[in-house]
From Swiss-Prot:
NCBIfam families registered for this protein in UniProt: 2A0113
Region (Basolateral sorting signal) location: 465-510, 511-532
Acidic residues composition bias: residue spans: 468-478
Protein's organism: Gallus gallus (Chicken)
Record's bilayer topology term: Multi-pass membrane protein
Parts of the chain on the Cytoplasmic side: 1-19, 85-93, 141-152, 203-265, 323-330, 379-392, 445-542
Keyword Nuclease attributed: no
Compartments, as annotated in UniProt: Basolateral cell membrane
Name of this chain's protein: Monocarboxylate transporter 3
Disordered: annotated span: 226-247, 453-542
Residues on Extracellular side: 41-63, 115-119, 174-181, 287-301, 352-357, 414-423
Originating gene: SLC16A8
Main subcellular localisation: membrane
Transmembrane segments: 20-40, 64-84, 94-114, 120-140, 153-173, 182-202, 266-286, 302-322, 331-351, 358-378, 393-413, 424-444
Length: 542
């Protein structure tokens, strides 16, 4: 459909996601940000031995640096959502890049472990969090039909950067020491600012016109008749009074939209993701030590993680391509369930691996399933809540995941110390992932069956299926039709005309039954005078 003319007071059509063009630049920026966010906390572990010597602390003390980074990445999700909704993605990412870089640079001058916690842990972790979440939001803004593929390609940044940052950190440590390495790594993090700079708002050129059109549209709704800003009305004493149109006050923008908790699909996803995170990260954390306990040499044991990373690089884009197929995308939640089930069964089957060949086979299948989970997790969330509410949804989901991250891996480590047996831990972690998969699949199936019994309202998107732009265009088109019907030209302001108009309005109010009450149909955009046209269409993908 063509765009409405803002100068005529009509609402302009929404800007369609280009699914390409500048979106590929945004995708590359998201690829880099995802790589830094997930790989950096693991890459700094190459400096731990030197930090232990200089600060005279144990391994568990230095490991808190990575833990604090991850806690900031997950736990500050709602804060990031509020900042994005208030200031936009680009300013937040620029600030985040400066914070991340400053944290590592300041860490190179620290004299004790506590200062490292505050600089490399808190500052750098917060900076990466302020980059990670907005980059995903922008990716969902620029891609709609190709969004599964875009998510898969962006998620591939994690294994690519993990396989490159760790060797780079080792080289920097040998040539410049840990302080010089921290300085250079801080400089690398300034690339986050570059990635933030390319996150151009999709509606930058339309924002001012849209606000102007909205103001005119609301003003015309409030006019008594005819579309004039003032209208003379004759009174009994022969004088004239003017009746001015009053503009409705604008509703404040929600900094954090908690209405997504009314979406049962979001609740199902959140519970499933919490259970998943309890066991998902346990096998790769314990894999090297598990291999060493079975008699595998140190170099070969470390190579197992490289196998997982290499397979992961190709698994994520491939899974994104599969999820984008027309016959797969409406059922992306079931594909996500299959990926989790595949991952959990891999953990369970590998629990009794007793030689290097068995561990290599485990790493191949774990890399495939782990890549599938990484490629689909945010695509499913976008399909559930839509791009408009994704900024709030991802912040709340990451906050809930933070608790699971703090519970799962530490608890597994304590069980290993107590039982001296890795087999039980792999069984437990795999069972948690399988439980998450079964819960998501069964809950989705039950909710879909319930939805089939009750006919859904019109324009309600199917589960994880259609694009966001189609329903947005239909809402704006409906608003334009109401606007063109209601805005009739004036026929005069004499006393007889005004009386006739007032009588017609009175009859119309009586016929409406509720005196101008707004229609309450879900997703319907009302253009009647005095009605709130800011209703939103709830996306209930499940």
């Amino acid at each position: 459909m063509g765009r409405a003319d803002p100068e005529e007071g009509q609402l302009p059509a929404p800007v369609k996601p280009p699914d390409g063009g500048w979106g590929w630049i945004v995708l590359f920026g998201c690829f880099v940000i995802t790589g830094f966010s997930y790989a950096f906390p693991k890459a700094v572990s190459v400096y731990f031995k030197e930090l232990m010597k200089d600060f005279h602390v144990g391994y568990s003390d230095t490991a808190w640096i990575s833990s604090i980074m991850l806690a900031m990445l997950y736990g500050t999700g709602p804060v990031c959502s509020i900042m994005v909704n208030q200031f936009g993605c680009r300013p937040v990412m620029l600030i985040g890049g400066l914070l991340a870089s400053s944290g590592m640079i300041l860490a190179s001058f620290t004299t004790n472990i506590i200062e490292l916690y505050l600089t490399a842990g808190v500052l750098t972790g917060l900076g990466m969090a302020l980059n990670f979440q907005p980059s995903l939001i922008m990716l969902g803004t620029y891609f709609d039909k190709r969004r599964p593929l875009a998510n898969g390609l962006a998620a591939a940044g994690s294994p690519v950067f993990l396989s490159s940052l760790s060797p780079l950190g080792q080289v920097l440590l040998e040539k410049f020491g840990w302080r010089g390495g921290f300085l250079i790594m801080g400089g690398l993090l300034l690339n986050c600012c570059t990635c933030g700079a390319v996150m151009r708002p999709l509606d930058a050129g339309m924002k001012r016109k849209t606000e102007k059109a909205q103001d005119k549209y609301e003003a015309k709704e409030m006019l008594p008749m005819g579309g004039k800003s003032e209208e003379g009305i004759s009174t009994t004493d022969g004088t004239k009074k003017t009746k001015k149109a009053k503009k409705k006050p604008k509703k404040g923008k929600k900094l954090l939209d908690f209405s997504i908790f009314s979406n049962r699909g979001f609740i199902i996803y959140t519970i499933s993701k919490f259970i998943l995170v309890l066991g998902l990260f346990v096998p790769p954390i314990l894999l090297v030590n598990y291999a060493k306990d079975t008699g595998v040499p140190d170099t070969e044991a470390a190579f197992l993680l490289s196998i997982i990373g290499f397979i992961d690089i190709f698994a994520r884009p491939a899974c994104g391509m599969v999820a984008g197929l027309k016959w797969v995308r409406p059922h992306v939640a079931y594909l996500f369930s299959f990926a989790m089930l595949f991952n959990g069964l891999t953990d369970i089957c590998s629990a009794r691996a007793s030689n290097y060949t068995g561990l290599v086979i485990f790493c191949v299948f774990f890399g495939i399933s782990y890549g599938m989970v990484g490629a689909l997790q945010f695509e499913v969330l976008m399909a559930i809540v839509g791009s408009q509410k994704f900024s709030s949804a991802i912040g709340l989901v990451l906050l809930i995941e933070a608790f699971a991250v703090l519970i799962g891996p530490p608890s597994a480590g304590r069980l290993v110390d107590a039982l001296k047996n890795y087999e039980v831990i792999f069984y437990l972690a795999g069972s948690e992932v399988v439980l998450s998969a079964l819960f998501l699949a069964m809950a989705t199936y039950c909710c879909l069956n319930r939805g089939k019994k009750t006919p859904p309202p019109e324009k309600n998107p199917s589960a994880g299926g259609g694009s966001d732009t189609e329903e947005a265009e239909s809402d704006v088109q409906e608003a334009e039709e109401h606007s063109s019907d209601n805005h009739q030209p004036a026929h005069g302001t004499d006393k007889a005309t005004v009386a006739a108009n007032e009588e017609a309005n009175h009859v119309e109010d009586e016929q409406s039954g509720e005196g101008g009450r707004c229609p309450e149909a879900d997703g319907e955009v009302s253009s009647r005078a005095g009605c709130n046209a800011d209703q939103t269409v709830e996306r209930d993908s499940f």
